[in-house]
UniProtKB/Swiss-Prot annotation:
Enzyme Commission number(s): 2.1.3.2
Molecular function GO terms recorded: amino acid binding; aspartate carbamoyltransferase activity
UniProt: carbamoyl phosphate binding residues: R58, T59, R108, H136, Q139, G264, P265
Gene3D superfamilies named among the record's database cross-references: Aspartate/ornithine carbamoyltransferase
GO BP annotations, alphabetical order: 'de novo' pyrimidine nucleobase biosynthetic process; 'de novo' UMP biosynthetic process; amino acid metabolic process
Record key words, sorted: Pyrimidine biosynthesis, Transferase
Role this protein plays: Catalyzes the condensation of carbamoyl phosphate and aspartate to form carbamoyl aspartate and inorganic phosphate, the committed step in the de novo pyrimidine nucleotide biosynthesis pathway.
PROSITE patterns: CARBAMOYLTRANSFERASE (PS00097)
Catalytic reaction list: carbamoyl phosphate + L-aspartate = N-carbamoyl-L-aspartate + phosphate + H(+)
The name this protein goes by in its record: Aspartate carbamoyltransferase catalytic subunit
Enzyme class: transferase
Complex and partners: Heterododecamer (2C3:3R2) of six catalytic PyrB chains organized as two trimers (C3), and six regulatory PyrI chains organized as three dimers (R2).
Gene: pyrB
Family (UniProt): Belongs to the aspartate/ornithine carbamoyltransferase superfamily. ATCase family.
Length: 312
């Protein structure tokens, strides 16, 4: 199995067939985690470079572990000690790394579209690890897989996204994937943090969490970006907590088997209470584990372009 593309730039333009191919490929990689030796030689001789212009704990380390478990060589570029601080352009940085025979380049950037710029200029496979407010496709995929693993289906699932939908690249990747796989999606948050016209995608909009949380199968809680308060997009942290924190009391309003998810890092006591984060309904740590297996699958399914390859 493979994807019919060399890059993973987002989920908006990834078809249902490719999404299902990824879901079907994750299980065998996850089964390696229970073995004493967790490595396979699938990518031996390949070089994976991570290029993160923004901070990351989970995503960068997850990609590194995934690549190493596939026996790839991994190079982490430290932006603040590289030529980037001397003004080197994104394309020149990418071409330099490709000249060093990098096969995969995993990039996180504050600029929406930065991975696409590299994909159009390089033969290496480009994987978007988060670009501005645009997308975070592997987070969307690991969230999708976690739901699939726990609920045994995606079609017909009722999924609620809570919080800052407007600025969340995680929300956007979740929405694109879930729409294509047939889930019913709802969002809830302050009106200033809900995108206009999101209902045109078939997404139901709520502003009352107590109402929205009833009858859903999955609650995916997004990190509230506290800097948004300075932009007057919500009045105060205290008011946000009162209206939108997922608490034990609100969890009791949902179905008994509702999944509680969070992409991390969590602001305990703000968007989610500690009781809920540590509850049996929470699968937050399982999301992290699944992220490694999902990223292993993505690395194996993409097809880097062979420069100067002869035609058949």
């Amino acid at each position: 199995m493979s994807l019919n593309c060399k890059d993973l730039l987002g989920l908006e333009h990834l078809g249902k067939k490719d999404l299902q191919t990824i879901l079907d490929s994750v299980g065998p990689f996850k089964s390696l985690f229970t073995r004493s030796v967790k490595k396979v030689p699938t990518l031996v001789g390949k070089t994976v470079v991570t290029l993160f212009y923004e901070p990351s704990t989970r995503t960068r380390n997850s990609f590194e572990i995934a690549a190493k478990r596939l026996s790839a060589d991994v190079v982490n570029v430290t932006v603040n000690t590289s030529s980037i601080v001397k003004g080197e352009s994104l394309i020149d940085t990418g071409k330099t790394l490709e000249a060093m025979k990098a096969d995969y380049l995993i990039i996180r950037h504050s600029l929406a579209g930065a991975p696409d710029i590299l994909a159009r200029n390089l033969n290496a496979s480009i994987i978007n690890a988060g670009d501005g407010f645009h997308e975070h496709p592997t987070q969307g995929l690991l969230d999708l897989y976690t739901m699939y693993e726990k609920k045994k289906k995606i079609e017909g699932l009722k999924v609620l996204l809570v919080g800052d939908i407007l600025h969340s690249r995680v929300a956007k990747s979740n929405i694109w994937a879930l729409i294509k796989m047939g889930a019913e999606i709802a969002v809830v948050g302050p009106p200033t943090l809900i995108p206009s016209n999101i209902e045109d995608l078939g997404v139901k909009v709520y502003y009352d969490l107590n109402e929205a949380i009833k009858k859903v199968d999955v609650v995916n809680i997004l990190r509230i970006q506290l800097e948004r308060q300075q932009e007057n997009l919500f009045p105060s942290v205290h008011e946000y907590v009162e209206l939108y924190q997922v608490t034990e009391e609100r969890l009791a309003m949902a179905k008994p088997g509702v999944l509680i998810m969070h992409p991390g890092p969590m602001n305990r006591g703000i968007e989610i209470s500690s009781d809920v984060a540590d509850s049996p309904n929470a699968v937050i740590n399982e999301q992290v584990t699944n992220g490694i297996a999902v990223r292993m699958a993505v690395l194996c399914l993409l097809k880097p372009k062979r420069k100067n390859a002869s035609s058949d």
